[in-house]
Amino acid sequence: MLLYLVNFQSMWANYVLELLKDAFAFKIKAKELDIPLAAYNPFRKQFSAQLLLDYVVERYKDGLVFAIIDEDIYDSNYNFVFGLAYPFRGAIVSTYRLKNFERIKKEVLHEMGHVFGLGHCNNYCVMRFSNSVFEVDEKPDKYCENCYREILNNGFYVNPKYVIFKENYN
């Protein structure tokens, strides 16, 4: 896996690198990448998540990619997004609105779930859709058993410590 740090000088970078290694046992190469100016929308004062992710996946064709950025990002259907993913290809997460380790962890795990082929989940699960930081705070930092099984069935690995097993439900 290639981790892109998009114009990113921050404590979050090492945290995300270690999280990806621990959660998914990836061998990771980290590179810094400049933000493409074409991805900036001056009317919205935000970057297009889709254009950024397209830019990142075009530069690395040999495996999965993950990008982290500390800029506000949006997708065409939303005022903002925390991240965006392409199944079986790559993802981007913005720390701009998340601002703390727990939220960033949840959104990294969430977007990687999409990379592994998952959709949104209605269970008590990190794959639950979040439209606000409050909703991010309310969801767990783990996959439910159903999502875990689907990830494994799609040929990927998740460290079981990032899974809520039924016997541990409250």
From Swiss-Prot:
* Residues involved in Zn(2+) 1 binding: 110, 114, 120
State one molecular function term (GO).
zinc ion binding
Q: Which cofactor does it need?
A: Zn(2+)
Q: What is its EC number?
A: 3.4.-.-
Record keyword Protease present = yes
Q: What's the domain of life for this entry? A: Archaea
* Xref: Pfam families: Peptidase_M54 (PF07998)
What keywords are annotated for this sequence in UniProt? Hydrolase, Metal-binding, Metalloprotease, Protease, Zinc
Q: Which positions, given as ranges, span the membrane? A: none
Q: Which residues does the annotation say bind Zn(2+) 2?
A: 121, 125, 144, 147
Gene Ontology biological process terms, A to Z = proteolysis
Cofactor binding mode and count: Binds 2 Zn(2+) ions per subunit. One is catalytic, whereas the other seems to have a structural role.
* Broad EC category: hydrolase
Q: Which residues participate directly in catalysis?
A: 111 (proton acceptor)
SUPFAM superfamilies documented for this protein: Metalloproteases ('zincins'), catalytic domain
The record's annotation in PANTHER family points to: ARCHAEMETZINCIN, ARCHAEMETZINCIN-2
The protein's role, per its UniProt record: Probable zinc metalloprotease whose natural substrate is unknown.
Q: Which protein family is it in?
A: Belongs to the peptidase M54 family.
Summarize subunit and interaction data from the UniProt record for this chain. Answer: Monomer.
Name assigned to this protein: Archaemetzincin
Species assigned in the record: Nanoarchaeum equitans (strain Kin4-M)
